[in-house]
Amino acid sequence: MAGTGASPTEPVVKPLETRATQEDPGRVSNPLQRWTAASVYPDMWADPDQDPRNSEGVSPDGELATLLDYLANYRITLLMKCEGLDAEQLARRSVPPSSMSLLGLLRHLAEVERDWRGWFVPGEPPTRLYGDGDFEGAAGDRAHVDEAYSDLAREQAATDAALAEHPNLSERLGAQKIAVRELMVHRVEEYARHCGHADLLRECIDGRVGQ
């Protein structure tokens, strides 16, 4: 499965009603009241018929297809963890003392996608999108949010296109002679790691949980 699935501006799943706390009206207080929209598998984010990920379909054949499928699913998961939140919530550093936010993750992964191309595409490495401010500069306004979604989609597509020219996983690319296989595994690892961060960030914002 390719692409990122649902539009970042339209929630994949309509949020359920939650019981808020007096301190933070957007967050669930009792761990037993943590909520998910899933009813078929309560540990999931959404039910299968509303989940754009390839979680119940036939698994792909071949190593490259499997890696691409995992990458696509983790990309979608990141967007799902951001759905239904306003700009302030997306920029909220909800797990102090970390400076991470969901918006910061979108910006960071756009930067990482851009950096990966510098490993193997001939020419000068691409300049950084946000300097050193992918997390620190993640401001809670609509313009920054729209920019981050646009940047991420563009950089993902550019890296996908560049790597599509190298389907042999054993081929070594760039000055460092990195194997395509290593780069593909690293891409999956990067998104998987940050989806774990997104789990905690989202739960601390409004209590919503689920794979």
List each language-model region with its residue ranges.
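Active-site rim elements
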Residues: 61-67, 145-146
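Short, contiguous alpha-helical
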Residues: 21-50, 54-56, 64-135, 173-211
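Intrinsically disordered, low-complexity segments enriched in serine/proline and basic residues
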Residues: 7, 11, 16-19, 26-29
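Acidic/histidine-rich alpha-helical segments that form the ligand environment
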Residues: 134-171, 182-187
